[in-house]
UniProtKB/Swiss-Prot annotation:
Name by which UniProt lists this protein: DNA gyrase subunit B
Keywords per UniProt: ATP-binding, Cytoplasm, DNA-binding, Isomerase, Magnesium, Metal-binding, Nucleotide-binding, Topoisomerase
Location of this chain's protein in the cell: Cytoplasm
CDD domains: HATPase_GyrB-like, TopoII_Trans_DNA_gyrase
GO MF: ATP binding; DNA binding; DNA negative supercoiling activity; metal ion binding
Catalytic activity: ATP-dependent breakage, passage and rejoining of double-stranded DNA
EC number: 5.6.2.2
SMART domains: HATPase_c, TOP2c
Organism encoding this protein: Mycobacterium leprae (strain TN)
Function of the molecule: A type II topoisomerase that negatively supercoils closed circular double-stranded (ds) DNA in an ATP-dependent manner to modulate DNA topology and maintain chromosomes in an underwound state. Negative supercoiling favors strand separation, and DNA replication, transcription, recombination and repair, all of which involve strand separation. Also able to catalyze the interconversion of other topological isomers of dsDNA rings, including catenanes and knotted rings. Type II topoisomerases break and join 2 DNA strands simultaneously in an ATP-dependent manner.
Cofactor(s) listed: Mg(2+); Mn(2+); Ca(2+)
Marked site (Interaction with DNA) residue numbers: 487, 490
Gene name of the record: gyrB
């Protein structure tokens, strides 16, 4: 990819196939970009960037530039071949076909198209971006000239030929339509994380991200690092300077010569590896390619991330199945052959072997089959056997060639197996339970009367006193209450046997009914709303983070499917004389309600006019219902998982052993400690 290929004739007007127009896109944007909220808005950037990355994957581009402007527009530029400008068979310039016809793109022409591999089926990309924008400008360098075109609500102008040039490439700038999207404000952190991921997956590709919206004197959190190396140990003076220094986000350059090796370094940068080298290999087949990088660390959680044609396959798929099968088989055979396991000993399980494993599996498939509309699970059956064969051959070679590291890996897996066996009694308490079977539920659970999971809610509440108020104030038809006594165990620092001996963890897993890890079965979930309700202070936030860490590490699909929420209890109660009280959820809202009320002639109680809630236990049942539990007025924040790798790193920093990394993160993000969106 690093060496640019000059073969524009391979990607010309004849490579473009038209399937249908854009009429339906503006009517049903959610079908094409997922939503009209923030996620859908950012999807516009992904579609344009993916097209530039396709040029890089095909070997024609080495650099992509992404720029966020003050006027809400986004510009994506690459130095690829440039979108064709020749007249298409339909009689219009090919660039107009690409920009105005749904599914029109070189990637739909099979072996005769401009691409052998592309990012899934996002050939709908630029045309959908055009359909959902008020204006799009396209500048092309191709065929010896500069070309420019614009689109007003997807209607093309006249293609203009400019000055002569020997350069090639495409620049697309678009303005998302505010009448379609709920917001047109892009989040730098979201964009940076996705672009960093793309750079990791495309070894040697340079991606520049510039945020023109940041003023020179504005202090912004450094939300992403563009280095894959582990942090260098700092002196006390350096730590002090680093903690107090403002982090300005204006320009980030992502360039990883090591590709997936750098990705694994990045994942493990706050952890302690148990082997010196990173395992790195690749393989090619008929219409398939696979690349793998992996390294074990001293932690207890696995961090395996899979991609197909640079698309993050959150739900895994056949490529992950092939990798897992090969790894489990190779490690068990090696352990038996080297007498690290006795012949009579049971085999190590996949969970045992993957404990502490950081791995990235990236496949390129000429004709990918993604299950569902979201493209998060690869379905190509032939990919499993291909990946399994490559991984089997390469892992056998690595284990034989690295006996010291191999022994450390096997011993860690054996230690994990011993912990698993020791936890067997505890695990029996958290076996999967039927969605309607109430047997064996924890005694402190106040269950709801409904047996329909779709309408049932579970409030996990901090403290018995708050749990009592919640039980009294709830609607017992559909709301269940599970009170917790104090802080649960930090699963980031404990092995599964210790985790499953914790009574609070037992109660949570048993109440949910799904089981954990490989036993997890989402169809057995007893509640489709799991609401974490803790005090609105630092201790409450810590408890919420502990609970989220448990769910992320042991029952991640609950988050992926959108079943987990954070309750938003009020911070203040304003008591007016001879009038109903009002509740404020922040300092600014308190000040606003007070100012408005006084202007309207209201009088605040003199002695206890403004009450600050120190905890949920200070609210009676009626207040808790009216402010935090009544579906008609409550505010719930849904916990989402857009980037598993970023979330994995975040939980490792917040709940892991690296104190310096945690201090640095908290210092940079101190201004927004109210809520951390995972």
């Amino acid at each position: 990819m690093a060496a640019q290929r000059k073969a524009q004739d391979e990607y010309g007007a004849a490579s473009i196939t038209i399937l249908e127009g854009l009429e339906a896109v503006r009517k049903r944007p959610g079908m094409y970009v997922g939503s009209t909220g923030e996620r859908g808005l950012h999807h516009l950037i992904w579609e344009v960037v993916d097209n530039s990355v396709d040029e890089a994957m095909a070997g024609y581009a080495t650099q992509v530039d992404v720029r966020l402007f003050d006027d809400g527009s986004v510009e994506v530029a690459d130095n690829g071949r440039g979108i064709p400008v020749a007249v298409h068979a339909t009689g219009v310039p090919t660039v107009d076909v690409v920009m105005t016809q749904l599914h029109a793109g070189g990637k739909f022409g099979g072996k005769d198209s401009g691409y052998n591999v592309s990012g899934g089926l996002h050939g709908v990309g630029v045309s959908v971006v055009n359909a959902l924008s008020t204006r799009v400008e396209v500048d092309i360098k191709r065929d010896g000239y500069e070309w420019s075109q614009f689109y007003d609500k997807a209607v093309p102008g006249i293609l203009k030929q400019g000055e002569a040039t020997e350069a090639t490439g495409t620049t697309i700038r678009f303005w998302a339509d505010p009448d379609i999207f709920e917001t047109t404000k892009y989040d730098f952190g979201t964009v940076a994380r996705r672009i960093q991921e793309v750079a990791f997956l495309n070894k040697g590709l340079t991606i520049n991200l510039v945020d023109e919206r940041v003023k020179q004197d504005e202090v912004v959190d450094d939300v992403v690092s563009d280095t894959a190396e582990a942090p260098v140990a700092m002196t006390v003076e350096e730590k002090s300077t680093e903690s107090s220094a403002p982090h300005k986000v204006r320009h980030r350059t992502f360039h990883y010569p090591g590709g997936l090796v750098d990705f694994v370094k990045h994942i493990n940068r706050t952890k302690t590896p148990i082997q010196q080298s990173i395992i790195d290999f690749d393989g090619k087949g008929a219409g398939h390619e696979v690349e793998v990088a992996m390294q074990w660390n001293g932690g207890y959680s696995e961090s395996v991330h899979t991609f197909a044609n640079t698309i993050n396959t959150h739900e895994g798929g056949t490529h992950e199945e092939g990798f897992r099968s090969a790894l489990t088989s190779v490690v068990n055979k090696y352990a038996k052959d080297k007498k690290l396991l006795k012949d009579k000993d049971p085999n190590l399980t996949g969970d045992d072997i993957r404990e502490g494993l950081a791995a990235v599996i990236s496949v390129k498939v000429s004709e990918p089959q993604f299950e569902g509309q979201t493209k998060t699970k690869l379905g190509n059956t032939e990919v499993k056997s291909f990946v399994q064969r490559v991984c089997n051959e390469q892992l056998i070679h690595w284990f034989e060639a690295n006996p010291v590291d191999a022994k450390a890996v096997v011993n860690k897996a054996i230690s994990s197996a011993q912990a698993r066996i020791a936890a067997r009694k505890a695990r029996e308490l958290v076996r999967r339970k039927s969605a309607t079977d109430l047997g064996g539920l924890p005694g402190k659970l106040a269950d709801c009367r409904s047996t329909d999971p779709r309408s049932s809610e579970l409030y996990v509440v901090e403290g018995d006193s708050a749990g009592g108020s919640a039980k009294s104030g709830r609607d017992s038809m559909f709301q269940a209450i599970l009170p917790l006594r104090g802080k649960i165990i930090n699963v980031e620092k404990a092995r599964i046997d210790r985790v499953l001996k914790n009574t609070e963890v037992q109660a949570i897993i048993t109440a949910l009914g799904t089981g954990i890890h490989d036993e997890f079965d989402i169809s057995r979930l007893r509640y489709h709303k799991i609401v974490l309700m803790a005090d609105a202070d630092v201790d409450g936030q810590h408890i919420s983070t502990l609970l989220l860490t448990l769910l992320f590490r042991f029952m991640r699909p609950l988050i992926e499917h959108g079943y987990v929420f954070l309750a938003q209890p009020p911070l203040y109660k304003l008591k007016w004389q001879r009038m109903d009280p009002e509740f404020a959820y922040s300092d600014s809202e308190r000040d606003g309600l007070l100012e408005t009320g006084l202007k309207l002639g209201k009088k605040i109680n003199k002695e206890d006019g403004i009450q600050r809630y120190k905890g949920l236990g200070e609210m009676d049942a009626k207040e808790l219902w009216e402010t935090t539990m009544d579906p008609s007025v409550r505010v719930l924040r849904q916990v989402t998982l857009d980037d598993a790798a970023a979330a994995d790193e975040l939980f490792s920093i917040l709940m892991g052993e690296d104190v310096d990394a945690r201090r640095s993160f908290i210092t940079r993000n101190a201004k927004d400690v109210r809520f951390l969106d995972v």
